[in-house]
Amino acid sequence: MTRSSVLADALNAINNAEKTGKRQVLLRPSSKVIIKFLQVMQKHGYIGEFEYIDDHRSGKIVVQLNGRLNKCGVISPRFNVKIGDIEKWTANLLPARQFGYVILTTSAGIMDHEEARRKHVSGKILGFVY
């Protein structure tokens, strides 16, 4: 299997483990983008704790699942999103208003769409979680 993207593979592994009812999942390789994405998911309660394991290669992450995640995914290519267009993207990607988050990478870091709107920053769209 060819790797489309490290983040896409990690989120796909989380989705598959969640569907099969697993309590934890091992992600490898790891990257800073994956860790920041997981921090946003953890902040909103979609996953439990996660631990980075340094194996002197690319690293591994063990994620504890809590059963609250319905779906998470990557948007590829990473489209530029202006502040005014965030609402359109949330309407397209999320199943309902006030349900789930679109995750963006901005100049102020990786954050969800509500935080980006509060901080008044735009950026590129990474993915979604609900």
Curated annotation (Swiss-Prot):
It is found in: Cytoplasm. Keywords: Cytoplasm, Ribonucleoprotein, Ribosomal protein. It comes from the Eukaryota. GO terms for biological process: cytoplasmic translation. Disulfide bonds: none annotated. The keyword Ribosomal protein applies. GO terms for molecular function: structural constituent of ribosome. The keyword Lipid metabolism does not apply. GO terms for cellular component: cytosol; cytosolic small ribosomal subunit. Its main location: cytoplasm. Belongs to the universal ribosomal protein uS8 family. Component of the ribosome, a large ribonucleoprotein complex responsible for the synthesis of proteins in the cell. The small ribosomal subunit (SSU) binds messenger RNAs (mRNAs) and translates the encoded message by selecting cognate aminoacyl-transfer RNA (tRNA) molecules. The large subunit (LSU) contains the ribosomal catalytic site termed the peptidyl transferase center (PTC), which catalyzes the formation of peptide bonds, thereby polymerizing the amino acids delivered by tRNAs into a polypeptide chain. Present with 19700 molecules/cell in log phase SD medium. There are 2 genes for uS8 in yeast. This is Small ribosomal subunit protein uS8B. It comes from Saccharomyces cerevisiae (strain ATCC 204508 / S288c). The lineage of its organism: Eukaryota, Fungi, Dikarya, Ascomycota, Saccharomycotina. The gene is RPS22B.
